[in-house]
Structures are given as C-alpha cells and as structure tokens.
UniProtKB/Swiss-Prot annotation:
Tissue expression remark: Highest levels in prostate, lower levels in thymus, placenta, and skeletal muscle. Expressed in embryonic and adult tissues.
Keyword Glycoprotein: yes
Keywords noted in UniProt: Cleavage on pair of basic residues, Disulfide bond, Glaucoma, Glycoprotein, Growth factor, Secreted, Signal
Lineage, highest ranks first: Eukaryota, Metazoa, Chordata, Craniata, Vertebrata
SUPFAM superfamilies: Cystine-knot cytokines
Source organism (scientific name): Homo sapiens
Highest taxon above the source species: Eukaryota
Name of the protein described by the UniProt record: Neurotrophin-4
Amino acid sequence: MLPLPSCSLPILLLFLLPSVPIESQPPPSTLPPFLAPEWDLLSPRVVLSRGAPAGPPLLFLLEAGAFRESAGAPANRSRRGVSETAPASRRGELAVCDAVSGWVTDRRTAVDLRGREVEVLGEVPAAGGSPLRQYFFETRCKADNAEEGGPGAGGGGCRGVDRRHWVSECKAKQSYVRALTADAQGRVGWRWIRIDTACVCTLLSRTGRA
C-alpha cells in the first residue's frame, strides 16, 4: 500500500517561494520634484541654493568682459564689482543707460507667460536634504537722485542723445526665466516668469509728434 502524501508539503513549498519585499511608499509631497530635464531650461540668472550666491553668474561676468585683463597686467578681481566689469582699455566709454545688477532674494510674485500674476515659491524641495531657495539675478535701470532722473538713469533721458530731435528714456527690459510658482488656484508648477534683465534706451522722434 502506497503511503499517503504528507499534508505538510504545500506548507513547505509556501516557505520556499521567493519573498517579494514590500517597499513603503513615501507620503506624497505638496510640491513637485525637480525633474532632471528642467535643468536644461534654467537660466544662468536663476540659482537654486541653500544660501545667497556670493557673486554674479559666471556667464554674466564673461559677457561683461570681467575676465579680459590687459596683457602682462596682474589680475586683481578682489575689488571688481558688478559695476566695474569693463576692460581697462574701455574705461573712457559711457553707457547710454546706467544699469545696476544684483541678486533678488525676496521675490514673492511675478507675471507668467500668459500675463497672469503668480506666486514665486520661496522653497524648492530637494531629494535627501533641506529645501533649496530660488534666487534671481536681475538688472535694472540705476535710479537717480533727481526727481525727474538725470541722463542715463531710469526714467530719465538717454546719455548722448540729441534732445532737439529725439525724446529718449531709459527703461527696464524683461526676459522670461523658469521658476517654481503657484497660480491663483494653488496649482504648483514650473512656469516662465518675467524678470528685469537689462536697461535699454527707447527713442521717439520729435518730428513725428503732434
């Protein structure tokens, strides 16, 4: 007579099956993670950091000629500020409009690509660490002490323009940069917002005015 199969065999096979680990899911974050492709859309004028940047963006210094030292002269960048980026051979040149640049550390609102006002979030979530803050390097027209603004200052006429034939004014020019924002409905996402990036001269012919 053949022996009956043991009833413990199914239990033994159950313990021999490979176990599948169950990973705990992290709680959903209220802010979206910073995806890798977004880094390609970030402007040099935007920095995500836990502390305010110590100096201007490198690209800004290169465009301004801060690293073009005269031949044979020792480099002395310790005293070079944002307003002193012109090469030594061009010290006699004057800008049509005076501009001042610096990091904006307390931006709260901005206008997006659709012309709507959005809230600029103060913190950006970072994996495995404390959140980052958003800093914007903006360039604006330099204010003048005079009430109406002097030549080259914001709100004043452009330097070197013949006032007999032209009406000129120095105005801030804006560009779009990527930033983490929230709209009026509370929807959080990366949007294009406008920030001041230059001070330009606008002209209006006096002969064409009424």
